[in-house]
């Protein structure tokens, strides 16, 4: 069963560009590790401290394989470490969604 990991970030609105660089780095890392990056999103209007990331997987087993690869990915570890050091992510929540309908690719 296809699933999507929906990540909601509370970000420091004064470090928007730092989060943008963080999100852009995942554009290479996630596919290399086996995830299907659906996108990262920053606020355009409205609340300025919330961002989102969506990553698709064929099933939970595919997600577990992705996690194992990600742990050994040098660029992935560096991206996590940079986020911790620079503190532009204040909070992160993950929800797992069952894909009911997805737009054609």
State where each predicted segment sits.
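Acidic/histidine-enriched, glycine/proline-rich intrinsically disordered or flexible terminal extensions
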Residues: 89-92, 96-105
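Short, surface-exposed ligand-recognition loops at beta-strand->loop->(often short) alpha-helix junctions
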Residues: 11-21
